[in-house]
């Protein structure tokens, strides 16, 4: 079998990977004409089956849950199928293909040990004569803030303060020195192409042009560009709504119909409430920046061949949740008038209100009012609204 060069894009998460993958998918034919092939058997956009291939049997996630892969035997069959499919796909490539592109941000979040990355190396080694690991890294607090929106879309029941606790140098998800070392230990430092996720440092101030430069491809009119933003964050209001729905209806519920409805609702929120979400306070930013300063400087020195701080010190604007009446009216208009919801969603809003009534009556009132917009004649809904109005006087 002809061996080729492999470009392995490992993320990291929250560094425009969805936009890159959409570009690669939409330009498959143009890339083939230039001798590059974007792997499809492991996932048509996100090649997620490959990082999942290297995960331990005792660790599961949404990838396996969605596919009902629950036992060690089912994992074994999944690995056999993934390996066979990849082999068939690469074996069938014409000789004109000199380079293979693989992309998944889940290499960053799911393959967190050197031994897991070694599994990836062993899987790919029959197919490459050379390999280049492409990795974008983003300042830790920005990563956290963007990740929080993704976690809400995925069903987290924990608020921002909970996830903030994990943003420490002990966590290889955020500690890029530790994370990159695992890849170096398996592939060698010279195989890594580490880029700072910062528009000011991109080639032509453009992420796609920058990524193409990593592939040693000149930007050209041969490629179509995806103009619609991909995988945007939720604004604070969308985050509050999404979190409340998740808390009322956690993913572990056995009622699949309710979970399906919840996902549809989260999708509506995603489409209508894009924007900058909550961020750390200036004090939290300063503490986190200092905690990562030395490891970030080492990454800057080792991989970017530069001295000083990896990221500029830039305190965020404190973007905390502030729900006012105008925002609620906007929510009602967008979620119900602009995108009509089926009557069953009144139950979701009603139960979200009941969840909040003992701890935050104003939020309970907001969600019960949403339920009334969908089901104006609901007896329990109207009774509760009257109770809330009396208590809020």
Residues of each region from the PLM?
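Anion-recognition interface
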Residues: 1-360
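TPR alpha-solenoid repeat register
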Residues: 348, 380-381
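TPR/TPR-like alpha-solenoid repeats
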Residues: 355, 387-392
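Canonical positions in the second alpha-helix
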Residues: 370-371
């Amino acid at each position: 079998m002809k061996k080729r060069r492999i470009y392995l894009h490992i993320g990291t998460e929250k560094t425009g990977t969805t936009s890159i993958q959409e570009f690669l998918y939409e330009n498959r034919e143009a890339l083939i004409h230039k001798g590059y092939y974007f792997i499809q058997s492991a996932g048509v956009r996100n090649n997620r089956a490959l990082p999942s291939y290297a995960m331990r049997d005792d660790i599961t996630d949404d990838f396996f849950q969605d596919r009902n892969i629950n036992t060690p035997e089912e994992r074994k069959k999944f690995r056999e199928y993934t390996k066979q499919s990849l082999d068939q796909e690469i074996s069938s490539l014409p000789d004109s293909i000199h380079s293979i592109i693989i992309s998944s941000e889940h290499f960053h979040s799911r393959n967190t040990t050197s031994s897991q990355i070694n599994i990836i190396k062993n899987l790919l080694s029959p197919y490459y004569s050379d390999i280049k690991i492409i990795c974008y890294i983003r300042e830790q607090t920005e990563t956290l803030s963007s990740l929080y929106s993704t976690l809400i879309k995925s069903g987290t029941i924990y608020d921002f303060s909970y996830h903030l606790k994990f943003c420490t140098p002990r966590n290889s998800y955020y500690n890029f020195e530790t994370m990159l070392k695992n890849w170096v230990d398996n592939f060698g430092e010279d195989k890594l192409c580490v880029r700072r996720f910062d528009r000011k440092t991109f080639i032509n101030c453009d992420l796609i042009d920058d990524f193409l430069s990593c592939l040693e491809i000149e930007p050209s009119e041969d490629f179509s560009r995806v103009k619609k933003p991909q995988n945007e964050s939720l604004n604070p209001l969308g985050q509050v709504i999404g979190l409340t729905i998740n808390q009322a209806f956690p993913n572990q519920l056995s009622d699949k119909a309710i979970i399906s409805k919840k996902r549809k609702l989260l999708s509506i929120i995603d489409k209508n409430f894009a924007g900058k979400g909550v961020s750390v306070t200036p004090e939290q930013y300063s503490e986190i920046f200092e905690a990562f300063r030395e490891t970030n400087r080492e990454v800057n020195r080792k991989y970017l061949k530069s001295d000083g701080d990896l990221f500029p010190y830039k305190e965020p604007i404190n973007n905390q949740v502030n729900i006012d009446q105008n925002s609620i009216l906007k929510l009602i208009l967008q979620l119900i008038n602009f995108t009509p919801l089926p009557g069953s969603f009144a139950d979701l809003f009603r139960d979200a209100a009941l969840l909040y009534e003992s701890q935050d009556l104003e939020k309970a009132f907001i969600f019960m009012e949403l339920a009334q917009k969908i089901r104006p004649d609901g007896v329990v809904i109207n009774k509760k609204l009257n109770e809330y109005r009396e208590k809020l006087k």
